[in-house]
């Protein structure tokens, strides 16, 4: 089966020794070069950029409004598919005999990661709007990411939560692998944070509540995300946000401990930077870092040099700005504990005074 042809392909390169991601300095006001797209490019009615493949470079997108379609137009999950056969079939959807890139009209580029790009696409025959993550097989093999890719697909397709992006399946051709996912109209939280600056308590508390809700669900299924950051959070209508990018996620029963150092440097926990074993509580630490960044515009331990960042993380060297409210400071400091056992549990995050005080002012009432 074609799915296994990718997984079992003979390796021609060793895995890189470091699996962390270095973020550029996140001083948002003074670093306009960090904006991935200009405001004009973010306009859904702006010109659609060139598609992924050379043969589709002149592919027209006749209805520009498809970039603004409501999430109700997005289908229920399309199950895993190869380019030759649909493996799982959803009776509520058209009975696809196959999926390939030719089945989609490609729109604007939504984002770019180390190993792939994400595009807005429309399924030709149904009009469904999705996001399509495109990865080069050559890159997957070069960096020995076959197992990681398969794990990402398996984890994302197993999750069903309003604050987690849905996976509709995947397919592949000779050169590339394509992940078909839920499309969220307002894009990355990082871009919103970069464009408008730090969030107020009302908006930040709403977002932290939703991420805590998603992580609590994942942890109950013994899944650790391991890469929480604004770039991996998408925003839909009515300030509904969804955690995405499960490339570093892993299934980890409570009795197990991990030692792989991965994720983004500014968000690493003390046990990671000190090469100690860790568990799901690293996500709680990252949630504290996220809360700090949403309220200030930059993560708490950010430095130009990686080693200096590591030292500040291990020493819990947190410089708390005076303009952060006392309730918000309390939440952040209870999440950013050196000892994982001392970190606030995600269920308690949702009942914290900072959350409860701001909840009546959220745009939509959360459950």
From Swiss-Prot:
Biased composition annotated in UniProt, kind: Polar residues: 1-29, 37-48
SUPFAM superfamilies to which the protein is assigned, alphabetical: Protein kinase-like (PK-like)
EC number: 2.7.11.1
Phosphothreonine: residues bearing it: 260
Gene Ontology BP annotations: attachment of meiotic spindle microtubules to kinetochore; attachment of spindle microtubules to kinetochore; chromosome segregation; homologous chromosome segregation; meiotic sister chromatid segregation; meiotic spindle checkpoint signaling; mitotic DNA integrity checkpoint signaling; mitotic spindle disassembly
GO molecular function: ATP binding; protein kinase activity; protein serine kinase activity; protein serine/threonine kinase activity
Database matches in Gene3D superfamilies: Transferase(Phosphotransferase) domain 1
CDD domains assigned to the protein according to its UniProt record, in alphabetical order: STKc_Aurora
Disulfide bonds: none
Entry annotation: catalytic residues: 227 (proton acceptor)
One GO cellular component, as annotated: chromosome passenger complex
Binding site for ATP: 110-118, 133
Phosphoserine: residues bearing it: 5, 76
UniProt xrefs under InterPro entries: Aur-like (IPR030616), Kinase-like_dom_sf (IPR011009), Prot_kinase_dom (IPR000719), Protein_kinase_ATP_BS (IPR017441), Ser/Thr_kinase_AS (IPR008271)
Function (record text): Component of the chromosomal passenger complex (CPC), a complex that acts as a key regulator of chromosome segregation and cytokinesis. Has a role in error-correction of aberrent kinetochore-microtubule attachments to ensure that sister kinetochores become bioriented and connect to opposite poles by promoting spindle assembly checkpoint signaling. Acts in opposition to the phosphatase PP1. Not required for kinetochore detachment from microtubules during replication of centromeric DNA. Phosphorylates histone H3 to form H3S10ph during mitosis and meiosis.
Name under which the protein is recorded: Aurora kinase
The organism's taxonomic lineage, starting at the top: Eukaryota, Fungi, Dikarya, Ascomycota, Saccharomycotina
